[in-house]
Design a protein with these regions (language model features):
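Conserved SAM/SAH cofactor-binding pocket of Class I
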Residues: 151-168
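Non-catalytic accessory regions of SAM-dependent methyltransferases
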Residues: 1-54, 58-60
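Short histidine-centered catalytic/ligand-binding loop motif
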Residues: 56-70
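Non-catalytic substrate-recognition/targeting regions of SAM-dependent transferases
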Residues: 45-47, 71-139, 147
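Conserved alpha-helix/loop element of class I SAM-dependent methyltransferases that forms part
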Residues: 140-156
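Cysteine-centered catalytic environments shared across enzyme families
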Residues: 6-29, 66, 70-93
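Short, acidic Gly/Pro/Ser/Thr-rich loop/turn segments
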Residues: 53-54, 62, 126, 135
């Protein structure tokens, strides 16, 4: 990977960070997506949850050796850490790969201690699990849907049977 490619990634990250940080403050949310596979050379999704970062790397074919890939990923994490101020030891990394029949998507992954934190969104609190599963349990791209349900379901009770996380 050339220095120019890393510079492109850093520039994109900075642009996204400035815009989305302002937006997060305006919306009073403590969890938001910083980057979503915007550049083909960086097939990752980067999400901020309070003072933690969740990185999902999309498995793909590439011409990098295992060693080169390791160097690429460490440099990528360093750029993210420098940009956000979140240290690498507060980053949680998952590998997303194509699954036939979605086997394993909802299976517990972690063999380490669970890291579950509380995040804020639209006056609500959600628990997110950064370690145990492929997903955190809170899908950030569904924020508008949650806002709609929050407005429509005011002063009512309902049971969400369509989401294994209960947060959609």
């Amino acid at each position: 990977m050339t220095p120019e490619k890393f510079q492109m990634f850093e520039n994109r990250l900075l642009k996204n960070y400035k815009h989305r940080l302002k937006q997060a403050k305006r919306l009073n949310v403590t969890c938001w997506r910083l980057y979503d596979h915007d550049l083909p050379e960086f097939p990752i999704c980067v999400e901020l949850y309070e003072e933690y970062i969740y990185i999902a790397e999309y498995n793909r074919r590439h011409a990098l050796t295992d060693e080169e890939h390791g160097i690429w990923f460490e440099e990528t994490k360093k750029i993210i850490a420098d940009m956000t101020g979140v240290p690498i030891d507060k980053m949680f990394v998952k590998l997303r790969k194509r699954m036939s029949h979605r086997e394993g998507q909802y299976e517990k992954e972690a063999v380490t201690e669970s890291k579950i934190i509380t995040v804020q969104e639209n006056g609500l609190q959600f628990l997110v699990n950064l370690t145990d599963y492929l997903d955190t349990g809170l899908f950030l791209d569904h924020r508008v849907t949650r806002q709609m349900v929050q407005a429509e379901a005011k002063d009512t009770h309902f049971l969400n049977l369509f989401s294994y996380t209960s947060s959609f």
